Design a protein with these regions (language model features):
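Conserved thiamine diphosphate
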Residues: 1-47
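Glycine-rich beta-alpha junction loops
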Residues: 45-52, 137-139, 190, 214
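Peripheral docking tails and interdomain loops at the edges
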Residues: 187-233
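Short acidic, glycine/serine/threonine-rich loops at helix termini
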Residues: 25-28, 52-59, 196-198, 220-222
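Conformationally flexible catalytic loops at phosphate/diphosphate-handling active centers
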Residues: 38-123
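Short, solvent-exposed amphipathic alpha-helical segments in soluble enzyme
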Residues: 28-33, 58-61, 145-154, 174-178, ...
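Redox- and metal-dependent alpha/beta enzyme cores, enriched for Fe-S-associated oxidoreductases
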Residues: 120-156, 160, 166-172
């Protein structure tokens, strides 16, 4: 449901904030990307981030496009002013299979363009890491503290935080599969992103999952223990 909101072979841009600041920033970014690619974008926030209180710096307000700018910049828009051009018909329904296939091929080309240009992720202490914690949202913040505790014990751990869950940072994770001994995917679920990580790693290193369910937020020590028991042992 993150990559695509349902059936139909389509994909959604999914942004995963890890702070209240990013919650605010990603609203503007989500609209910007949705407008740029004419593609739905979703902000995949978790309950922990949603209940946090932090200082936020809001961006300067941008002026709205004038009607003339909309017509110039958005030739696809249904503005109600079709003088001088053919009407824009906006629909996902094509009754002819041949026409529908052409549409779908065009969409797939757009998705490849998004995958090439819009992958976002954060790396923390990955330069010398022997083990990697892969996490998004609030779990990435908890994982960062777990990384610090692990390094105090002499375990070289880095964090890779996907910011876009689609497009997913597949190439970045695949590159680390040649450098680290194992990866622990930490999530507030029974295991969802781990499948994407395993596909990226392609069996090169061990990939295991640690998660808590039902709204329970784990302690950083639990992640360190999971790393030691599932990956390092």
């Amino acid at each position: 449901t993150v990559k695509g909101g349902g059936h139909g072979d389509y994909k959604l841009i999914a942004l995963a904030p890890a702070s209240v600041q990013e919650m605010a920033d990603f609203v503007a970014l989500g609209f910007e990307l949705a407008f740029k690619y004419r593609n739905p974008a979703i902000i995949l926030a978790d309950g922990v981030i949603g209940q946090m209180m932090e200082k936020v710096v809001l961006p300067a307000q941008k002026p709205r496009r004038t009607d003339a700018e909309v017509i110039e910049q958005c030739p696809w828009a249904a503005t109600g002013k079709a003088k001088g051009r053919k009407p824009n018909i906006i629909t996902s329904l094509e009754l002819k299979p041949e026409a529908m296939e052409i549409n779908n091929i065009r969409f797939q080309a757009k998705y490849k363009q998004i995958e090439e240009n819009e992958v976002r992720f954060e790396e923390i202490n990955c330069e010398d890491a022997e083990y990697l914690i892969v996490a998004f949202g609030s779990m990435a913040r908890i994982g960062q503290k777990a990384m610090e505790l692990a390094r105090e014990k002499g375990i070289k751990v880095g964090i890779l935080r996907p910011i876009t869950l689609w497009p997913f940072p597949t190439k970045a994770i695949a590159a680390y599969a040649d450098k680290v001994k194992g990866m622990l995917v930490t999530e507030l679920n029974a295991g969802q992103m781990i499948e994407d990580v395993r596909l990226a790693v392609n069996g090169k290193v061990k990939v295991e999952h640690f998660g808590r369910l039902g709204g329970i937020v784990p302690d950083p020590d639990e992640i360190v223990t999971a790393l030691e028991e599932k990956i390092i042992k």
